[in-house]
A protein has these predicted regions:
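Bacterial N-terminal signal peptides that target proteins for export
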Residues: 1-8
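N-terminal Sec-dependent export signals
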Residues: 3, 21-24
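Bacterial N-terminal signal peptides
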Residues: 9-18
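Glycine/tyrosine- and acidic-biased, solvent-exposed loop/turn segments at the edges of beta-strands
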Residues: 23-250
């Protein structure tokens, strides 16, 4: 009976390992080619992945992660919270617009349909619904940090913008200084007059918890912080600070 139990446990472990190995695989592309990301119901001929790069595929040969061949508009996982409703396209051709004005560039707004332009030659990761969990954005994006709370932040282009599966922001680069709550603020900033909001520096990387609290970022000004053991520390400005389980580290 004991041998049977051991056999069953080993068999289950082997089956689990086989299933996990079957669920995802990688492939190096010998040429730039059209591949279909997971969650797509209609293939896009313009969505190509770069030659010589590695793509991660699921069991249906759909792309989980891959390197884009060129800039392309895709829908981010947090698209419901994004307020980029239009993008501008400029042209000074004699054929566009119809009335030609020499040395004049005309910008015309086009609806985005909740899409964001992602940068080519950079990796993107797709969620199971076909939206982009993470990728390098090629335009500034203004979005609610948490899907259930009010508050808009603009993230810089040319940097990665990541989302949690529920659409809340996971990480990005702040365009401007912003007042935000660090993770663990209830104990770390007990009695604070600003209700736990402190200023984080723009032009720096930042990451958030699913609830919209800062888990790492660069402070604009030094602040006092109470660690879980009750000790008080000064967190310096212009330094990347991590907030983990109520403890601040740098």
């Amino acid at each position: 009976m004991k041998k049977l139990k051991v056999f069953l446990v080993v068999s289950l472990l082997c089956c689990g390992l086989s299933m996990s190995m079957a669920e995802a695989k990688t492939m190096t592309l010998d040429k730039t080619k059209v591949l279909v990301p997971q969650g797509f119901s209609v293939a896009n001929d313009d969505l190509k992945f770069k030659k010589g790069t590695v793509v991660e595929l699921n069991e249906n040969n759909e792309v989980i992660t891959g390197v884009l061949n060129r800039d392309i508009a895709l829908r981010p996982t947090g698209w419901r919270n994004v307020i980029n409703d239009y993008y501008e396209e400029s042209n000074n051709s004699i054929f566009y617009p119809r009335i030609f004005h020499p040395f004049t560039s005309v910008s015309i707004p086009f609806p985005t349909y909740a899409h964001v332009r992602y940068k080519g030659n950079k990796p993107v990761t797709f969620a199971t619904d076909g939206t982009v969990l993470s990728g390098t954005i090629d335009e500034e994006v203004t979005v609610s940090v948490n899907k259930d709370k009010y508050g808009l932040i603009t993230f810089e282009d040319q940097y990665e913008l990541g989302f949690y599966p529920d659409g809340s922001v996971k990480n990005g680069r702040l365009r401007d200084d912003a007042l935000l709550r660090p993770y663990g603020f209830k104990t770390g900033l007990a009695g604070d007059e600003m209700a736990g909001f402190v200023e984080f520096a723009g032009g720096k990387d930042i990451s958030f918890s699913k609830e919209g609290y800062v888990t790492s970022g660069v402070l604009k000004k030094a602040i006092s912080w109470q660690q879980p053991d009750g000790t008080m520390v000064t967190l310096p400005a212009k330094t990347m600070i991590s907030f983990i389980n109520g403890q601040a580290r740098y």
